[in-house]
Structures are given as structure tokens and as C-alpha cells.
């Protein structure tokens, strides 16, 4: 089954302990925007406490500028370390990271560096995300995403054994510009998210 690998990765966790979902937004895609908002609501529905990370002021116009992107990552990661420094990860029976864009890099790097065993939802990941991606992740990508080339994302996801859901003609927000199509996309995406979160 699609989610078996994620379930196997977290099978030995204490299901009776509290559950925590951490939201890692993008630079311009905040936690109150559709993908993160509805994913958070689903997580709350399944009993997760919700914590949203905030990065503060980051460099603008980073697209296509490797130096600025690196600076943005380092600043955002530093803010993330500070925001999460008091969390006792071992006190939670289930941990879920929900991330978007540069947030997928930050979430994956944080989980890797702190050896956090949990599930991860990657909305519109960047190629750098897969440098850190761990078992128990799923990813969503639009084929018209100007921030990440589809063939590269597909190849990296296959190499890391990360289930990847492709949305034709969708941009970096998983939107097409057509309202009815976008409503259908968010519904289909959240159905996948719901099944992923609900799988023990």
C-alpha cells in the first residue's frame, strides 16, 4: 500500500501519548493559506496539537538566486531552531511535519539533524529538500511549478522512495488560475493528506 513505508517508520511510537504537528510555511506562503490551513485542520481533527513556525524577515526575490536562497534557508533554519528548542520530542507519540516550498527543506533538514521519527507532508518541495528527506514522507508537486523542474522532482522522489502526487498544469501554490479547477485540486490533495494522516 502507498503509505506502508511511512507507517512502518512510525509503528513503534506510543499511540496514547500526545501528538504534535509542526507547520513550516514558505517564504510568501503562510500557514493560513489553503494547503497549510486545511492540512492543519485535518491534523487537528486527528488529535494533533498544532505549532506553526515563523521565520521573521527573509530576503526577497530569491527565485533563481542561489546565494539569496541559501541565505534565506540559513536565516529561516536558525529561527526554526530557536522556535523549537524547548520541545521534548520524545514526549510525543506521533509527530507530523507539514511544510511548503522552502519550508520543506527546513523541515526535512531539522528532522534529519535531530533524528526525529515522524511523518512529513511536503507541499511543492524544492530539489534541495531531497538532500534531507527521511522515510515517512509524501510530496505534492505541480507540473507548472517554476521553482522546481518536474523531471528532477520525480527522479529525486523515486530515489528517496517518497510517494509523489503530481498535479498537471499547477503552479507553486498547486493552483492553475481556474477557480473551479483549483477547488478540485485542493479537495483531491486533502483527500490524500487525510489518508496519510489517518494511517497509523
Predicted regions and their residues:
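Short beta-strand/loop motif that positions the catalytic acidic residue
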Residues: 133, 139-141, 145, 153
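Gly/Ala-rich beta-loop-alpha elbow adjacent to hydrolase catalytic centers
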Residues: 95-108
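Active-site nucleophile loop of the alpha/beta-hydrolase fold
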Residues: 26-27, 55, 121-129, 142-144
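A conserved short beta-strand
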Residues: 115-126, 135-136
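Serine-hydrolase catalytic machinery in alpha/beta-hydrolase-like enzymes
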Residues: 2-91
